[in-house]
C-alpha cells in the first residue's frame, strides 16, 4: 500500500474500509443501546418521580408504556412548508393520528405522519417504538418540548448559552416580496434557535442576528 499513488490508495481504502460502514459498526459496537443508557441518563435529564409509572417507563425504555417524545430539532418540509419535529422517543409507541399533549405549551395536538431518516431521506412508517430517533408532522412545538398523552412532568428545557453577536438588515428589492421574506425568516428562526429575527420599529427593517458573519452567510 505504501507504494500506491494517492488515487489508488483512496480507491483501496474505499473498497476495503468504506467510511459509512466503519462508522456505523463503531457506533453499534461502542455506543450503549437505549435500554441500557436510559437507566443512567433519565435521572440526569428528567426531574420527575422515578418510582412513578411514567418514571419506570422512561427508565426501562418501555415501548408499551406511557408516551414520552422530546423534540430536539425543527425541520421545515421544503414541499409543504410545514414543521417536521425531530427528536427521541423515550417511552411508548408513536402512531399516526394519535392526539398528544404538549406539556410546555399546555395544548393538545394530533400527530399526522411518522418518519425515520435514512440518510437525508425521510421514510414514512406506521408506528415507531421507544428508543428511536425519529420525526413527526402535524405538531407545532419548539425544540425542548415534551410530548405525552396526558400532562406529565416535562424534561428539562433546552438552554442556549450562546447569544447572537452580529446583526444584519435584510431587505427586498420589491415591496411585493416582503411577505415572502417575512415567511422565510420565520422558517429560519424555527429551524435554528441561535438565530434571532426582529423588526426595527423605527426604520421598519427586518433584522437577523447570528453567531457571526459565516453563520449569517450560510443561512
Where are these regions (language model features)?
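Structural and coupling elements of P-loop NTPases
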Residues: 1-219
